[in-house]
């Protein structure tokens, strides 16, 4: 690059001399030797490449009319170095833009994380206080836990007076209500015409569709038909009296036809009593829900006798 610039400068200098006599020629008439020497003296320029810049130093006696002027040098500088400088500026601006964009994205992520943390903290403190009474009532978790014998909701059961024996007895025979609004949104309707059943997921739907299928498995003893062969085998144990499910606790060995009955029986050995009496002051616990319901009726009869005595 440096050699090319020197060559171009030399060529332009020779053109700038035009028809002037060489340095060894005789001086013209009418001009002194000093004036002529100043006229033909070339521009003293030093060219160098310094990290992308052109450094030049014109001679102290350079003439403004010379072809090899500051204007020419400026053009050379623009032609050789303007574009890379612009590219460097563009790159700097791009980096600044990416930096700002990254900061904005990071700020957005921090904001989202903060929002999620606030939401989780809000849920942890307890949103249930602001829920509608209908949801906190019979459709609440406390109500369902009570119906399974775990605990009584604080404040009692909505719409039921436990001091009234009739309402208490009626409540003892009730089952947990179904949240129809929730089921209508999440359940899958049975596609069979005339069937209004709704299932919670596809696995339950596939199992339910077997009901509408042909009942090819018929009991030879009583003629009852079943969709699945496993159901027929379980039913046939009623006729044979076979009890394949045996209690493995030491000293027991009691046998059952159904695995459900075995699981209920095992609670006797484990001492698990899941169903608790909800009445205040009564801490009775029971293995089966039917025993709890029967026990609740005793409270109803006691309250009735007390009212009659008054």
Swiss-Prot record:
Keywords: Activator, DNA-binding, Isopeptide bond, Metal-binding, Nucleus, Repeat, Transcription, Transcription regulation, Ubl conjugation, Zinc, Zinc-finger. Expressed in kidney, epidermal keratinocytes, prostate epithelial cells, bronchial and small airway lung epithelial cells (at protein level). Expressed in malignant kidney and several carcinoma cell lines (at protein level). Expressed in embryonic stem cells, kidney, epidermal keratinocytes, prostate epithelial cells, bronchial and small airway lung epithelial cells. Expressed in embryonal carcinomas, seminomas, malignant kidney and several carcinoma cell lines. One of its GO terms (cellular component) is PcG protein complex. Residues 1-15 have a biased composition (Basic residues). Its main location: nucleus. The keyword S-adenosyl-L-methionine does not apply. Induction: Down-regulated upon retinoic acid addition to F9 stem cells. InterPro entries: Znf_C2H2_sf, Znf_C2H2_type. GO terms for molecular function: DNA-binding transcription factor activity; DNA-binding transcription factor activity, RNA polymerase II-specific; RNA polymerase II cis-regulatory region sequence-specific DNA binding; sequence-specific double-stranded DNA binding; zinc ion binding. It is found in: Nucleus. Residues 1-35 are annotated as: Disordered. PROSITE patterns: ZINC_FINGER_C2H2_1 (PS00028), ZINC_FINGER_C2H2_2 (PS50157). Polyubiquitinated by RNF12, leading to proteasomal degradation. It comes from the Eukaryota. A zinc finger (C2H2-type) spans 188-212, 217-239, 245-269, 275-299. Disulfide bonds: none annotated. GO terms for biological process: female gonad development; male gonad development; meiotic cell cycle; regulation of transcription by RNA polymerase II. There is a cross-link at residues 231, 233 (Glycyl lysine isopeptide (Lys-Gly) (interchain with G-Cter in ubiquitin)). Belongs to the krueppel C2H2-type zinc-finger protein family. Involved in the reprogramming of X-chromosome inactivation during the acquisition of pluripotency. Required for efficient elongation of TSIX, a non-coding RNA antisense to XIST. Binds DXPas34 enhancer within the TSIX promoter. Involved in ES cell self-renewal. This is Zinc finger protein 42 homolog.
């Amino acid at each position: 690059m440096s050699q090319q610039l020197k060559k171009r400068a030399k060529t332009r200098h020779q053109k700038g001399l035009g028809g002037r006599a060489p340095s060894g020629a005789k001086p013209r008439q009418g001009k002194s030797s000093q004036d002529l020497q100043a006229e033909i003296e070339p521009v003293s320029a030093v060219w160098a490449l310094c990290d992308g810049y052109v450094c030049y130093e014109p001679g102290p006696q350079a003439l403004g009319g010379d072809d090899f002027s500051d204007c020419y040098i400026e053009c050379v500088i623009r032609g050789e170095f303007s574009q890379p400088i612009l590219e460097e500026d563009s790159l700097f601006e791009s980096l600044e833009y990416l930096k700002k964009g990254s900061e904005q994205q990071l700020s957005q992520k921090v904001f989202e994380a903060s929002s999620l943390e606030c939401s989780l903290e809000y849920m942890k403190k307890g949103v249930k206080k602001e829920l509608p009474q209908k949801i906190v009532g019979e459709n609440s978790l406390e109500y369902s836990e009570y119906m399974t014998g775990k605990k009584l909701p604080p404040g009692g059961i909505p719409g039921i007076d436990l001091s009234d024996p009739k309402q208490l007895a009626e409540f003892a025979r009730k089952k947990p209500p179904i949240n129809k609004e929730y089921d209508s949104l999440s359940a899958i309707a049975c596609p069979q015409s005339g069937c209004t059943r709704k299932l919670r997921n596809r696995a339950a739907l596939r199992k339910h569709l077997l009901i509408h299928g042909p009942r090819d498995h018929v009991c030879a003893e009583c003629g009852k038909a079943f969709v699945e062969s496993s159901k027929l085998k379980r039913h046939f144990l009623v006729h044979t009296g076979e009890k394949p499910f045996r209690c493995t606790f030491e000293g027991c060995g009691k046998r059952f036809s159904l695995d459900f009955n075995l699981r209920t029986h095992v609670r006797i050995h484990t001492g698990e009593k899941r169903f608790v009496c909800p009445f205040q002051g009564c801490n009775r616990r029971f293995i089966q829900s039917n025993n709890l319901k029967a026990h609740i009726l005793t409270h109803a009869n006691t309250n009735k006798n007390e009212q009659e005595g008054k």
